[in-house]
Regions:
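N-terminal loops that bind phosphate or other acidic moieties
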Residues: 1-571
Length: 571
């Protein structure tokens, strides 16, 4: 990201890092260029590319055997100078006594001019030079200067690198490069501008509810915006609709490249790539190869591009050949997802022992469902301050999923909670609350309440949670609410008959409130230091909600004595 660029020598320092990381890459400091020092012995023609920095791993990622011979980087978003390009071209031509050099040039005015001047200088030295221009950006299809060169550059460089290693001549490589560029189109969309290296602020303002559709890789604003931030599947469909109107999709299929613009997570890219594959195959388009990653970026712009290349005979084989370069592109795509069946296992203990009668168990689940729905926003806010912000979704989503399971499978409510949290809710909340509900299931599913059995269940849950999770009272976790609740319910005989569960709920609420004064020593909140002080632990609040729901069901006449959620989380 451009938050961590040095004050000066940005590009040189990055080139030094690349050369140190990959020993097969050499660095010339003045003029600045990078050279692959271990070319394939059959290669007769050198491949040279370059352009402004900030798009990495473009160009440098394919420097090496099976890719480029030399890369010429300019300053961030600035074309390299002709002297740089000429020096790199000469060095690549002389390494292995090549028959000529092919320039791969993105269609930007500065790149076109400087590569043309360098080509003239190199030809004057007696070295043949040809040029392939990559102009794939569909958003600039009607621009006077022609389409911009963007994502298809990676495809052109990969296919030409494979053919060059087989000893192809200059004319053959230039012809293939032109054909691949003509068969390729790209389109990009962004949700947030890149960070400007000059002032470390967004390069432009984009309303968070909109997407810039057709954004350029230098931050050139798009002609269109998509309002109301449409869902990603609709965005992908629109992009493919437009691309397929310009890309040949014959019997050899297509190469599809999904590239981050620098600030898009790998999780998002995997989702987008799955949607691309699903959409294309549903249209009858064969996807020979599907690549998803950071290939052509715009510093840290939050967005992605899709590139489609319609394949001709022989191209698929070139794509599938391996490379010895910093960037490794995947070969043939799977035609379908390989779906594996889970191993068979015995029925869960909760489900096997839970009675099928609805009774208190279903009433407890329904009450907890209502309580959790009201608490969702507050639990999320608490976890955003003390953790990663997912607790509200995990806990409340788990309760909702348990309701659906109970409806569908006809099992008792607390057993459904146990199954759902243990097997389907992620993070630490899933297994921890799964242990609680598993312990409660045999007793909470009976009506009226068996207080001694519930007391024993809470004690079992507490013992199991502390043994596996490692937390103890005072660590600012759910244990700080569960332990006092278990203690309150374990009083024999009950201090106040008919009020045992309400007393346990009060104890859990008081315990949850006290966590606001504790320093977290377990869980993600322990990493946030002072940020977690003054706020109750969300897990402890959820325990208080569980005990409150249990008390509401079995001691409804006392429900008014328990505080509502806003008061519950205030110390």
């Amino acid at each position: 990201m451009s938050h961590f660029l040095p004050e000066d020598e940005v590009v040189l320092t990055a080139c030094q890092g690349l050369a140190l990381t990959y020993p097969g890459i050499g660095l010339c400091v003045e003029p600045l260029y990078l050279l692959a020092t271990r070319p394939a012995p059959q290669r007769r023609v050198a491949l040279v590319a370059g352009g402004g920095a900030g798009h990495e791993p473009l160009h440098t990622g394919l420097l090496g055997r099976g890719g480029l011979d030399a890369v010429v980087p300019g300053a961030v978003f600035t074309s390299p100078g002709s002297a740089q390009i000429a020096a790199a071209t000469l060095a690549a031509a002389l390494l292995g006594e090549r028959d000529g050099v092919l320039h791969i040039v993105k269609n930007y005015t500065g790149d076109r001019i400087n590569f043309a001047l360098a080509a003239d200088q190199t030809r004057a030295a007696g070295i043949p030079v040809a040029e392939v221009v990559v102009d794939d950006d569909l958003a600039t299809d009607r621009a006077a200067a022609g389409r911009r060169g963007t994502g298809a550059t990676v495809v052109v460089e990969k296919l030409l690198g494979a053919l060059a290693d087989q000893g192809a001549d200059l004319d053959g490589l230039a012809e293939l490069g032109g054909q691949v560029a003509a068969a390729s189109r790209s389109i990009a969309v962004c949700a947030r501008a890149h960070t400007s290296p000059a002032d470390r602020a967004p390069a432009f303002h984009l309303d968070p509810r909109t997407l810039d559709y057709g954004i350029g890789i230098h931050g050139e604003r798009a002609a269109h915006t998509l309002a109301d931030h449409p869902s990603v599947d609709l965005v992908v469909t629109r992009m493919l609709d437009e691309l397929l109107g310009h890309v040949p999709t014959g019997p050899y299929g297509v190469i599809a490249v999904v590239s981050s613009l620098g600030g898009t997570s790998d999780l998002e890219l995997r989702i987008i790539s799955a949607l691309v594959h699903q959409d294309l195959t549903s249209r009858g388009v064969h996807v020979h190869a599907l690549a998803a990653g950071a290939y052509v970026t715009a510093l840290d712009m939050a967005g992605f591009s899709i590139t489609l290349t319609g394949l001709a005979p022989g191209w698929a084989g070139l794509w599938d050949l391996p490379t010895d370069t910093p960037l490794r592109l995947p070969g043939s795509a799977a035609s379908t997802t390989t779906t594996l069946a889970p191993p068979t296992h015995a029925p869960s203990a909760a489900r096997a022992t839970a009675p099928t009668a609805q009774g208190g168990g279903r009433a407890f689940l329904d009450e907890l469902h209502q309580v959790a729905a009201l608490a969702h926003t507050d639990l999320t806010a608490l976890d955003q301050a003390t953790g990663d912000g997912d607790f509200g979704d995990n806990f409340c989503g788990g309760v909702t999923a348990a309701v659906h399971l109970a409806d569908r499978a006809g099992i008792a409510g607390t057993a459904a909670l146990a199954d759902t949290f243990r097997d389907h809710v992620g993070g630490s909340s899933g297994p921890l609350f799964g242990m609680l509900f598993t312990a409660l299931a045999p007793s909470a599913d009976r009506f009226p309440a068996d207080v001694p059995a519930l007391a024993a269940a809470l004690r079992r849950a507490l013992s199991r949670i502390t043994a596996i999770g490692g937390a103890r009272p005072g660590d600012c976790t759910l244990v700080d609410a569960l332990a006092p609740a278990a203690d309150a319910l374990a009083v024999t005989p009950p201090a106040e008959p008919g009020r045992a569960l309400t007393a346990a709920a009060h104890a859990a609420i008081d315990g949850a409130r006290r966590t606001a004064a504790l320093t977290a020593r377990r869980g993600r909140a322990s990493y946030t230091g002072y940020h977690s002080e003054g706020l109750p632990d969300p897990g402890a609040v959820a325990i208080a909600l569980v005990l409150t729901a249990l008390a509401h069901v079995h001691e409804p006449q006392l429900a008014g004595e328990l505080p509502a959620l806003p008061d519950m989380i205030r110390s």
